[in-house]
Amino acid sequence: MENFPTEYFLNTSVRLLEYIRYRDSNYTREERIENLHYAYNKAAHHFAQPRQQQLLKVDPKRLQASLQTIVGMVVYSWAKVSKECMADLSIHYTYTLVLDDSSDDPYPAMMNYFNDLQAGREQAHPWWALVNEHFPNVLRHFGPFCSLNLIRSTLDFFEGCWIEQYNFGGFPGSHDYPQFLRRMNGLGHCVGASLWPKEQFDERGLFLEITSAIAQMENWMVWVNDLMSFYKEFDDERDQISLVKNYVVSDEITLHEALEKLTQDTLHSSKQMVAVFSEKDPQVMDTIECFMHGYVTWHLCDHRYRLNEIYEKVKGQKTEDAEKFCKFYEQAANVGAVSPSEWAYPPIAQLANIRTKDVKDLKDVKDLKEIQKPLLSSIELVE
């Protein structure tokens, strides 16, 4: 295994942050914690329901970690949407992370997907059954065009996760494969479209700006994620099917050349994002800029990405890139380093246990299916 290219990573990260003019001022600390807890609380109650617990079959610790990660991503990045929209998006994107971490073969449950869809029957695949049940709560925030993007991109994501289960990096010479798979499983159009709730944006009046933003966000969001994930995935055997490593196989190039390819694409996309929208509708530009800055803050502060290890390693070094990286990291930590103990409570497992006890206490239940129905509408917040 090669040594991690720390100096190269520092230089790339610094250039990215400079290009997007990173300065996350999306929230005060109190506002950040308030939004985190609001979104978490609603989502935790959603996933604690008996139906979700029964169909998802996810280890409680993993589900808890997944929800905390996603709530952080949504609250930090979707800084301009309502708290209710943040909560509903947090539920939706937690479902996607659960699927991404799954190793179950989807083939048997997808045999009659379209026939069931056309007939209005519940999907055989449990993930689709739950996602479809929650989708109206997400789509109520958006107009028809953005909603269509959310639906289509989620469908693409499912297919991308299906492909990833084969751990296939592409055939040598298949240069289109890495980007094909990354666009499929990147949720870029879902993310890009979910920035524009109808209560804040006139979808028809800003149709061209929104369409362009979705197009630009598709690559920017996934490439930044791939770049910021490169350290944690570098020597992790479970993360060997990544865009960079697929470039190595399909393009028949070295790891350094593949990283350089990703770097140049990410920096170019960042320049485009700023240049294209700087002269457009101010509210559109503000939303995009807040997303970019919050998205970077989330990556720098979320322990899933382990970038604190890079910071500790280079802190005190006198190189220009090390000093700039540390300054950016500290800037992000000052606004975004919030302990989950301040907002991620109560735990999902605790809520699920309470619900299980309540169900067991029900008397004279004539139909077992009744107790499998959601006890809480996912559009209600439980304080």
Curated annotation (Swiss-Prot):
<dbReference type="GO" id="GO:0016106">
    <property type="term" value="P:sesquiterpenoid biosynthetic process"/>
</dbReference>
<protein>
    <recommendedName>
        <fullName>Trichodiene synthase</fullName>
        <ecNumber>4.2.3.6</ecNumber>
    </recommendedName>
</protein>
<keyword id="KW-0456">Lyase</keyword>
<dbReference type="Pfam" id="PF06330">
    <property type="entry name" value="TRI5"/>
</dbReference>
<dbReference type="InterPro" id="IPR010458">
    <property type="entry name" value="TRI5_ascomyc"/>
</dbReference>
<dbReference type="InterPro" id="IPR024652">
    <property type="entry name" value="Trichodiene_synth"/>
</dbReference>
<dbReference type="GO" id="GO:0045482">
    <property type="term" value="F:trichodiene synthase activity"/>
</dbReference>
<dbReference type="InterPro" id="IPR008949">
    <property type="entry name" value="Isoprenoid_synthase_dom_sf"/>
</dbReference>
<comment type="pathway">
    <text>Sesquiterpene biosynthesis; trichothecene biosynthesis.</text>
</comment>
<comment type="function">
    <text>TS is a member of the terpene cyclase group of enzymes. It catalyzes the isomerization and cyclization of farnesyl pyro-phosphate to form trichodiene, the first cyclic intermediate in the biosynthetic pathway for trichothecenes. It serves to branch trichothecene biosynthesis from the isoprenoid pathway.</text>
</comment>
<comment type="similarity">
    <text>Belongs to the trichodiene synthase family.</text>
</comment>
